Amino acid sequence: MKKLMGIALAVAVLAYAINLLFDAGVFYRVQDINLQQCQKIPGISGAEDIAPLKEGGALISSLNRHDNAPGALYYFQQGQAPLRLPGDYPAEFYPHGIDVWQKGTETWVYAVSHGSRGDRIETFRFERAAMRLVYQPELSRSVGKNINDISVIDKSRWLLTRDHAFSGMLGRVEDYLRLPLSLVLLVDDAGEHTLLDGLHFANGIYYNPQRGRLYVAETTNGTVSSWAWRPGEASPVLLGRFTGLHGVDNIMPDGDGLLVAAHPQLLKLAAFQKDAQARSPSLVWQLSLGTQGAVERSQIYYQSHGQALAAISVAAPLGGRILMGSVFDDGLLTCGEQ
């Protein structure tokens, strides 16, 4: 009996390990797709996230994660070099996910920043005519730890992803065991509230206020979940989970659908983080939505072994093309018909 139990346990552990390796993309075959229509844009490091502007151009979160220097926000317009925006940045500014809120002629920029005392949302007003940022301390605030991305509802209400419950070694254990301990937080004038829990490495987030639809990328199980929710409602209603997307990262709207950047081989992403010569593959999905707003279909827009830009973490429509950035690599990639 003990022998049978031991065999059953060994089989269960082996099956779990194989499933874990599958989710990490170890068995995923990378094929180069749509490389010929892409152009590399130098002049920026660690462009983890992109926020397109309604009047054209985009703001970009930039941080060289291979040194300890603070980061910055950049402005980019098709056909021009990335411009580092001057402004009164906080002393500790290490940006990750960003979003913008625009009303009339004014634009506010919200950036997740990882500081020595925890994470903050640092808020700026973007003065387009002067091409500069003005820090808004009254709209900035501490938000705990392990915050990854932000989707802005309005000037003082935001949705945040908390990708891990723990940091350091315990955070790695959380990943290896695929523990569903990740959250989506609603931040408003009353404080921080848990909107969703039980998620696997909640990463990118996008909220469509017109349709009342919320989308969350769960990295370690390669899923984008779709939810119906509007401010004032108690809990989001799950519309569906679309699986098989491999290491999903940031989510961006693209017409009637979504663009989702992904890391198809997560172990290579971890290696690239430590060694810039160990290129990490890149993948961008185009997702189609059904009549209820849930993700229903997917197709690959771009895929590579990381030759031009490794570890692509975001893809956003801009000026009739698709602009891509990477969390760990240098430069941008712009793709599409000229």
Segments the model singles out, each with a brief description of its role:
Residues 24-45, 80, 84, 133, ...:
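A short helix->beta-strand "capping" segment at the edge of beta-propeller domains
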Residues 39-71, 309-314, 327-330:
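Beta-strand-rich domains and repeat architectures in extracellular enzymes and scaffolds
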Residues 60-70, 112, 160-179, 260-281:
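Short, conserved, GDST-rich strand-edge loop motifs in beta-rich repeat architectures
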Residues 208, 245-302:
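Loop/turn-rich, solvent-exposed surfaces of beta-rich toroidal or solenoidal domains
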Residues 44-54, 88-104, 141-158, 164-166, ...:
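Beta-rich, blade/repeat-based domains predominating
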Residues 12-36, 71-76, 177-182, 283-294:
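Blade/loop signatures of beta-propeller domains
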Residues 71-114, 250:
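Blade-loop segments of beta-propeller domains
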Residues 26-30, 55-87:
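Beta-propeller domains
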